[in-house]
Amino acid sequence: MVIYYKNGDEFYNDNREIIDNNLIENSFFKLNYPAIMGFERKNFCIKIIDNEKYLIALNRDPYNLLLFGDVSLCDKLAYEIYSHNLHINGVLASEDLVNEFCKSYTKYSKFKFDDLFSMGLLVSNEVSDENDAQKASIEDIKLLQDYDKKFHIEIFNEEPKIDHEIIADNYYVYKFNNEIVSCAHKTREEENICSISGVYTNPNYRGKGFARKVVSTIRNEIVKSGKIAYLYVDNNNPISSHLYKSIGFKLLVNRKEVKCIESNIKRVVFAGGCFWCIAGAFYNLDGVLEVYSGYSGGKKVNPSYNEVKSGTTGHMEAIMIEYDSDKITYENLLKTYFENIDPFDGDGQFIDRGSSYQTAVFTNNENQKIIFENIINDIQNKYNKEVKVKLLDENIFNFAEEEHQKFAIKHPDKYKHEEEISGRTKFNKINI
């Protein structure tokens, strides 16, 4: 069974026990669920259930896909994400979950992942005698903002996607000769746990134990307040791992972070009336890898053919094309699309009438939008008519029922008959 949650609140309410009983591992779920306002292409929550097994997933753009649960359900989750054209930037979870999910997702999508980090999740409920760091002051904020950016660049090799608010009361610093040489801060504080993050030492003062002093001070305060302290450490940095373990932190679980690699395998979604007919125009193009029939443009997940045809769901019949951009360009695909529709008809296509048969191109890519506008202008100037094809943001794609997939290939005679009775074969195709 698959559950597609309407928003983050519904997701958390349904999985509160799972998340709260494993809160240290799932603190990012707790942090991000309030920002999920719907089931959207880049922001979504899903749960896979198989008897007593479960796998929960949360994706909040621009962050990573979060996973927790049974590794055996990764293949099912990967298919759901792929088949709905959902967007992920990367994955963060336990090593076994990340490895299995990426293997499954690559099988379906042909996309690739790049390993970023192997991290140890360490916890501590001990107190030490080291309390040499101090809380930051308002005067320290400017330098802490600079350190926060340097920390992010050093760890992730890029500037932060979102500027973090520096709250002095959460930051601790160690000063040497009245200069901040090391800092860290508390974050993701819950009733029973609190994380230590952003541990950064000025490169000129490293190897002198200053980070240890800062982390020990913060950890002591957290533990004295009745909470468990936790932090992440790069498994490829044995010095940091040894430092934290030497002051009482213990390994809870190893976690892994990967990012999606930009590749030559792309996807595009077109609505061009009857998906049987429009799909047939792309099957034999060199560089086209897959053509799927489905529904896009509406809110309901997995609508049926009859629901879409009724015009009540807001969906249009559409196709999702997966292609090799080294062999065929987006512009060539778009030209093929326009050559196989009536771009001047805004109420359907040929014999098929109604909102579910309207035409649309789905994209968020600015370059693709420019290509679309250029083609539209060329057509309108040449034919002196208004093009009625909509340009819409990328949306969730829902695979149509199996009998609608590869219809032209499975049933060539029926496909030819459908083209004839629909009026497509008699239509004078435009030239671009």
Report residues per predicted region.
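A conserved beta-strand-loop-helix scaffold within acyl/acetyltransferase catalytic domains
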Residues: R60-D61, K161-Y200
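Acyl-donor-binding surface of acyltransferase catalytic domains
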Residues: R60-E130
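Conserved active-site alpha-helix within GNAT-family acetyltransferase domains
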Residues: L97-F111, R212, N236-V253
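Conserved acetyl-CoA-binding loop-helix of GNAT-fold acetyltransferases
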Residues: S72-Y79, T201, G207-E221, H242, ...
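Conserved donor-binding loop and adjoining core beta-sheet/short helix segment
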Residues: I3, L23, K30-H84, A184-C194
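Short amphipathic alpha-helix that is part of the acyltransferase structural core
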Residues: M1-F28, V123-N157, H404
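Flexible coil/turn and secondary-structure edge motifs
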Residues: S263-I432
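Conserved beta-strand-loop-alpha-helix junction that forms the acyl-donor binding cleft
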Residues: L92-V98, Y230-S241, E257-E262
